[in-house]
Amino acid sequence: VLIVSARSTAYSVAPLIYGFKHFNPAVKIAGIVFNQVSSPSHFAYLREACVDAGVECLGYLPMTEGLKIPSRHLGLTLTAKRSMNTLIEQAAELVEKYVDLDKLLSICHRNFPCRYTLPYSSEIGVESFAPSAKKMKIAIARDPAFNFIYRENIDRLSALGSITYFSPVYGSDLPDADLVYLPGGYPELFARQLHRRKKLMEALRTYAEEGGKILAECGGMMFLTRSLTVRQGGTAYAMTGILPLDCTMVGARLHLGYRRIEYKGMELRGHEFHYSNVVAPDAMPSVAKQFTARGMEVSTPLYRYKNVIAGYTHLYWGETDILKLWEV
C-alpha cells in the first residue's frame, strides 16, 4: 500500500502513481492512501487519478494540524510517549472515518507474486539458535540519546534472553550482561551529559577489555570513540575511548542510503543516516565491505576491537542470527 502526499497536487498525481505501478515489476502497488488532503472535492480529483492510473484508491487522511510532527536534522522530533499515543489515537479515528478498511483488509488476504529482497527463510527461527543463547542477558541503551532501534531487532533479542534497558544520559550503571547493544540516536545533543558519565564509561571500557560483546550503531559508535566535537571551536567532549577514533559534527554532511554489508562470509542489511564524521576513519581498518542498494561500494567502515563491533550502519537483522557476528 502506497501512501502519497497530496499536498499541492491533484489530478496531476496520476503520472506519479502510474510510474510507481510500472517502474519495478517486483513491487506490486495494491492500493493507495492519500495524505494531507484539503477537502472532499480535492479527494475527488485524486480518486480520478487513481482510476486512470489503474490503481485502487483506498481513501485519504485530511490535512489535520494536530497530526503534524516537527522534524529536525535526523528526522522526526521525538515527543513524550503520552502525547504520541494521543496523536496515534487521533490518526486512527481519521483512518476509520476516511479509509475503506474493508477493502484494505481484503487486499491483505490476496496473494501477490513478489521477489523477496531481504534475507528470508521460513526455516530460520529462534529454535535454530544455540540453546545456550536463549539464556543470554542483554543490556540495551535506551534514552533520548540512544533510541533508533528496529522493533524487529528487539524481538530478536527478546527471543535470545532477558533484556535490561539502561540510560547513559541519566546515569544508569552498566547492567550485568552477555551482550551490550548501543543503538543510534542523538549523542551530539547530549554530549555534555554523556561526558560526565565517568563510571559508566569506565565500566564499558572494562567490559570491552575483558572480551564482552558490544554492538554499537551510529550514535552508539560515537559514544565509544575518544571524543565528540559538536561545533566549530567547541569542546571535544571525552567519550568512552574504546575505539581510537574521534567524531565531529563540524562540517556536517548528510550520509544516507541502504547498505549491504559483507563481513567474513555473512551478509547483513541496514541503512546509513547521519551528519557526523569520524575525523580520521582509517585510524582503524574496516573489517567489512559495504555497498549501496545498487551494488556500488562505499567507504562506510565497520570497526572491530576484540568483541566490540561498531559502525555507522543501523543493522536490520531480519532473520539473521546476529550472534554469528562474533563467531566468524
Label every PLM stretch briefly:
Residues 17-19, 47-51, 153-159, 196, ...:
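Short, solvent-exposed amphipathic alpha-helical segments in soluble enzyme
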Residues 11-125:
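Internal gly/pro-rich beta-alpha loop/helix module
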Residues 134-209:
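Phosphate-binding active sites in nucleotide-utilizing proteins
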Residues 97-101, 146-156, 164, 249-252, ...:
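C-terminal and late-domain segments of enzyme folds
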Residues 1-8:
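Inter-motif core of Ras-like GTPase G domains
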Residues 187-262:
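Cysteine-nucleophile active-site neighborhood
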Residues 1, 30, 178:
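Conserved acidic residues
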